């Protein structure tokens, strides 16, 4: 572990407490000059570290995000982590890295802002700076294309677990890839895969996750104002949340869950779709049906109006409003 990583860990263990350069150097078995250099680098990554003559260093809390901080809490800290100030799309960057062979299993790409964030069915995902976490994880799972839906369900489970553990917030899952809080969408997941045509196996998958942490300063665009939400009203409400830890926990949970066969119990228990009349949108066509359950392979079991049963593996679903029900 580098001096910078060890210094970050030391500061976080004593958050809001003064640590002298001399004490830090003794603890980390390095020179005070090395401590100064590590602190300078951490500040450049966005950490608020105060210092004064003969006083020492103190790390102030806040929703900081850095490559070093994420690696510190990863179960597999050797995987590549890259944070960009701005990208068109983290999924696009991750796919390019995967195609070139640069990105192995678990490689992580984040952007503080996306210019062209994407959701399912070609939709855009609003990704302003200082409002959310926008990341893509490269996976090279031993799965067939038929099992691909379980990668998305694994990602939804991973985000729910991480948000519960780090933020203390319970999220609901809307089949197949949206997460809700207080009846507002706070997270979208987009999974894209490249497969071997002959074997039917997935060569690699890219899981894009957009998580709204705080309400944007200028609010959401008019077309999503009624449906979009965030975990916290503003940054001050999330002062206790370390974004690096949250990102690392999402990755840790995803890498663990994607290796676990089948559908997680949490995905079924936290799903808000089964047991409701729903509207299914498939292209320009819509129809109503009753959502019965989530199948073991992640598909949605619906009862059509003629009484027949259908298994959905794709499509847009929404709960039919009570005012629309006869």
Predicted regions and their residues:
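Residue-level signal for inorganic ion chemistry
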Residues: 35, 90, 135, 178, ...
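N-terminal lobe of the biotin/lipoate ligase/transferase fold
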Residues: 2-164, 187
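Long, positively charged amphipathic alpha-helical accessory segments at protein N-termini or as interdomain linkers
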Residues: 1-30, 44, 144-145, 153-171, ...
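Short, active-site-adjacent cap segments at secondary-structure transitions
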Residues: 58, 179-181
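Alpha/beta catalytic cores of group-transfer enzymes, especially the acyltransferase/condensing modules
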Residues: 173-177
